[in-house]
C-alpha cells in the first residue's frame, strides 16, 4: 500500500519526486468523465501534445470540458516538472486510451498525461522522474500493476504517443523511462541494514499534529495532547511513525521528549 494514496486519490499536498500533489478538485461525472467504476490493471503514458503549456492549464481544461462538453477526452493525472494534478479518482474510468467505450485501455488503465518541454531538458527530465515516482506509488497501491503493465498510449491504438519518448527527445526513450521506474522502485524497496528499536516519547506542547506522512506537507489527521506518551516504531527525517498506525508526528525537541 502507498501512504500517498488514500481512497483512490493522491494525498493533497504530499511530495512525489520533485512535485507537489494537487488533488483537492476531483471531477464528478460529467461530459468528459463518465463516472464508471474500474479496477485499474495498467498505467498508460501520454504526452499532452503541446510544448511549454503548464500542467495547471490542462487541469483546468479538463474541468471546463467536463462542465460544458466541448471535449469528451479525460485522464486521471497531469504530471508537470513541479506539480502533479489529479483530476479523476483511480477507481473511476477516464476516456484517454482511444480504444472505445469498452476497451481495456479506457476501462482498466490509469491515464497519465505529461507536460512537454522540447527545448528544456532539465524540466523534461523532472517530468519523467516525477512520473516514475508516481508509477511506483501506483504499483504499491495496486499490486496487479507491474512494470510490464506500464504501457504507451501507442499500445492501445498505435497513436504516436508519448511523442517525446518515442522520438528520443534529449536521448530519453521508452527503455530509459522504464529503467527510471525500476530504479525508483528499487530505491524505495531497499532494505534497511539496522533493525529499528521502538521507543516511547511524551508530548511536551499543548497540541501536536498527526500527519499521514513524515512531513508538514502531508494531510493532518489528528492531534496529540500534552503529557500523553506514545510509542514510535519508525523514523524518517526527524519524524516518527506512531505504533497505533494513526500517522506520523514531528520528533523535534521542542515537541517531544524520550521517556
Which functions belong to the PLM regions below?
Residues 214-219:
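Short alpha-helix capping/helix-loop boundary micro-motifs
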Residues 48-49, 105-106, 110-120, 136:
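Cell-envelope and extracellular/periplasmic
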Residues 1-26, 32-37, 115-197, 259:
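Basic/polar, cationic surfaces and motifs that engage anionic cell-wall
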Residues 221-258:
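SH3/SH3-like beta-barrel superfamily modules
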Residues 49-53, 82-85, 90-95, 116-120, ...:
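Solvent-exposed loop/turn segments at secondary-structure junctions
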Residues 1-105:
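N-terminal catalytic cores of peptidoglycan-degrading enzymes
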Residues 187-209, 223-226, 235-236, 257-259:
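SH3-family beta-barrel domains
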Amino acid at each position: 500500500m502507498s501512504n500517498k494514496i488514500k481512497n483512490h486519490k493522491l494525498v493533497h499536498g504530499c511530495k512525489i519526486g520533485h512535485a507537489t500533489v494537487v488533488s483537492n478538485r476531483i471531477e464528478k461525472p460529467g461530459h468528459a468523465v463518465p463516472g464508471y467504476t474500474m479496477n485499474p490493471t495498467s498505467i498508460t503514458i501520454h504526452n499532452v501534445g503541446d510544448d511549454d503549456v503548464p500542467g495547471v492549464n490542462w487541469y483546468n481544461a479538463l474541468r471546463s470540458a467536463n462542465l460544458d462538453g466541448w471535449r469528451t477526452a479525460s485522464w486521471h493525472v497531469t504530471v508537470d516538472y513541479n506539480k502533479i494534478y489529479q483530476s479523476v479518482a483511480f477507481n473511476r474510468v477516464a476516456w484517454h486510451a482511444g480504444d472505445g467505450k469498452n476497451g481495456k485501455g479506457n476501462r482498466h488503465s490509469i491515464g497519465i498525461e505529461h507536460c512537454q518541454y522540447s527545448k528544456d531538458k532539465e524540466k523534461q527530465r523532472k517530468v519523467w522522474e516525477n512520473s516514475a515516482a508516481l508509477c511506483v506509488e501506483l504499483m504499491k497501491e495496486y499490486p496487479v500493476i507491474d512494470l510490464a503493465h506500464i504501457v504507451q498510449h501507442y499500445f492501445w491504438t498505435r497513436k504516436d504517443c508519448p511523442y517525446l519518448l518515442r522520438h528520443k527527445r534529449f536521448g530519453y526513450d521508452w527503455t530509459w523511462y522504464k529503467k527510471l521506474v525500476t530504479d525508483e522502485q528499487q530505491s524505495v524497496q531497499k532494505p534497511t541494514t539496522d533493525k529499528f528499536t521502538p521507543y516511547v516519547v511524551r508530548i511536551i506542547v499543548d497540541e501536536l499534529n498527526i500527519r499521514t506522512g513524515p512531513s508538514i506537507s502531508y494531510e493532518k489527521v489528528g492531534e496529540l495532547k500534552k503529557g500523553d506518551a506514545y510509542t514510535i516504531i519508525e523514523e524518517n527525517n526527524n519524524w516518527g511513525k506512531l505504533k497505533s498506525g494513526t500517522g506520523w508526528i514531528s520528533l523535534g525537541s521542542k515537541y517531544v521528549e524520550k521517556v
